[in-house]
Amino acid sequence: MTTLRLLISDSYDPWFNLAVEECIFRQMPATQRVLFLWRNADTVVIGRAQNPWKECNTRRMEEDNVRLARRSSGGGAVFHDLGNTCFTFMAGKPEYDKTISTHIVLAALNSLGVMADASGRNDLVVKTPDGDRKVSGSAYRETKDRGFHHGTLLLNADLSRLANYLNPDKKKLAAKGITSVRSRVANLTELLPGITHEQVCQAVTEAFFAHYGERVDAEVISPDKTPDLPNFAETFARQSSWEWNFGQAPAFSHLLDEHFTWGGVELHFDVEKGVITRAQVFTDSLNPAPLEALAGRLQGCQYRADVLEQACKSLIAEFPAQKGELRELAAWMAQAVR
């Protein structure tokens, strides 16, 4: 019986692909070696311990319909589009060894005519007249009896968009958590004009087969029908949830301030697991009562634009004379936390 398994996703949904990865990883026999190939449409993927409000321009992402996906491995934030090819290698212990999967990817690149080297813990780089340029980044996860190595290969990614989403607004945000390190990157199309996702997948697959001396047929994973994977529906629901993607952020504090025609406002939030644990409101408004009431309404709310906006508007019934001010405040607050 073969010990290899090859899976290829035809979905561009990051939550679907990460849920597939998680399910395969949890249920694979310890004797199996798995290669999973996939790619995502416009997505910022953050590490397990990262804070999306600190790492990303969440407002710009929402405007441009870019998804946020939190992965189960550590490391930094990356932007995925269809110019990235994603790979995941899985194996049971003691056989799991990320140097083996790194060797397979390097062999695949070599077969395409690209000489790359491993650099540091996570990157593959190519030498250019301008110095080393990163063409692949990776992250890893291990449990007691198994491990995986997943990463991306930059084929024809829109590198100009990296800065759009991975540079957060200059918010007054004091946050804990892992900060991403920006690297100089290059697309493989600069070295191999016309290279395609399919060609790269084929090269990685052949290198995978060659290393283990076996061949297997590919299993195509599609969202058109629920994959036959244990607990997939529950895993997908969690992977796509606000509670996982945003709510798992490390604790942080956020200060918002604005001056309106009716007075200045400062909001101080402490946020844990995506929920406001403390809210303070300061104002020089001549009628501070609605704002004092707002602090109590916000405590315990999810740190979401729509939730905060609704909490503010809910005070209109209690303070109808300040309807205009409360609507203005609600709109500003929703925009400020996006």
Curated annotation (Swiss-Prot):
Cystine connections: none
Domain BPL/LPL catalytic: 29-216
Pathway it works in: Protein modification; protein lipoylation via exogenous pathway; protein N(6)-(lipoyl)lysine from lipoate: step 1/2; Protein modification; protein lipoylation via exogenous pathway; protein N(6)-(lipoyl)lysine from lipoate: step 2/2
An annotated GO cellular component: cytosol
Signal peptide positions on this chain: none
InterPro entries registered for this protein in UniProt: aa-tRNA-synth_II/BPL/LPL (IPR045864), BPL_LPL_catalytic (IPR004143), Lipoate_ligase_A (IPR023741), Lipoate_protein_ligase_C (IPR019491), LipoylTrfase_LipoateP_Ligase (IPR004562)
Top-level taxon of origin: Bacteria
Gene3D superfamilies xrefs: Bira Bifunctional Protein, Domain 2, CO dehydrogenase flavoprotein, C-terminal domain
One Gene Ontology molecular-function label: ATP binding
Main location: cytoplasm
UniProt keyword Ligase, yes or no: yes
Keyword annotations from UniProtKB, A to Z: ATP-binding, Cytoplasm, Ligase, Nucleotide-binding
Family classification: Belongs to the LplA family.
Note: In the transfer reaction, the free carboxyl group of lipoic acid is attached via an amide linkage to the epsilon-amino group of a specific lysine residue of lipoyl domains of lipoate-dependent enzymes.
Subunit structure: Monomer.
UniProt xrefs under NCBIfam families: lipoyltrans (TIGR00545)
Protein known as: Lipoate-protein ligase A
Organism: Salmonella choleraesuis (strain SC-B67)
Gene name of this polypeptide: lplA
